[in-house]
């Protein structure tokens, strides 16, 4: 009503509204709102009033407050160990050491660990996930201590897979003692850390996409973006200012 003044809606009115959105909202929010009104225009048959969404430039840097570092990850693991939460400690190391999704923890079974390889089925795709020797030893020792002789290693007291929410809550409880920004601490960030470390060694994005189970390399690119700090250091080292 603010833009139509109780008069007919014109293309100019919609463009004015789009400009208002650009000045007051983030790009993704603007595009979401534009998609809604475009759908309404299609429903009403007002196709000539539709407007284009804003182009969203691919993110180049990861905000520092969101990137979990290797040192912070190590502190989280040590804190979990000090709190005698060995299950959480090993969940962190398993996700970060293999690059699997939280939902794929169910494939980390005693049988898979003994074999050093888990066969993961996710999103209509099957892939093999290798389990390195050191992680294998830790997981088998934990399973033996818990009396788990077969099947899933990470389970609740009732034998069900641990939910993402439970892992998230337990991870957040480590933040203060581990001195890690809570904004960085969520399960999927461990997968991102795996991706950055792997790419830093191999520089093979296609191979990394296969390991992570991505259908598109564009998704993998999002995982390996670093903070602006690293980019700034590289530019400083170029020494092109005379």
Task: Name each model-derived stretch.
Residues 1-242:
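Conserved catalytic core of the tyrosine transesterase superfamily
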């Amino acid at each position: 009503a603010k833009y139509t003044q109780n008069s007919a809606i014109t293309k100019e009115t919609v463009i004015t509204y789009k400009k208002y959105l650009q000045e007051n909202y983030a790009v993704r929010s603007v595009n979401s709102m534009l998609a809604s009104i475009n759908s309404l225009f299609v429903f009403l048959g007002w196709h000539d009033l539709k407007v284009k969404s804003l182009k969203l430039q691919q993110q180049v840097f990861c905000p520092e407050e969101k990137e979990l570092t290797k040192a912070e990850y190590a502190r989280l693991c040590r804190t979990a160990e000090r709190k005698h939460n060995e299950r959480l400690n090993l969940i962190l190391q398993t996700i970060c050491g293999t690059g699997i999704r939280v939902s794929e923890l169910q494939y980390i079974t005693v049988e898979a660990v003994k074999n050093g390889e888990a066969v993961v089925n996710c999103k209509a795709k099957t892939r093999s996930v290798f389990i390195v020797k050191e992680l294998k030893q830790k997981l088998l020792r934990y399973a033996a201590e818990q009396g788990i002789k077969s099947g899933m290693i990470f389970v609740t007291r009732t034998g069900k897979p641990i939910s993402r929410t439970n892992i998230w809550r337990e991870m957040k409880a480590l933040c203060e003692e581990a001195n890690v920004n809570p904004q960085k601490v969520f399960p999927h960030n461990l997968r991102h850390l795996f991706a950055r470390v792997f790419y830093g060694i191999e520089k093979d994005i296609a191979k990394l996409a296969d390991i992570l189970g991505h259908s598109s390399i564009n998704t993998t690119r999002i995982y390996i973006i670093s903070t602006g700090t690293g980019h700034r250091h590289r530019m400083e080292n170029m020494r092109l200012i005379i």
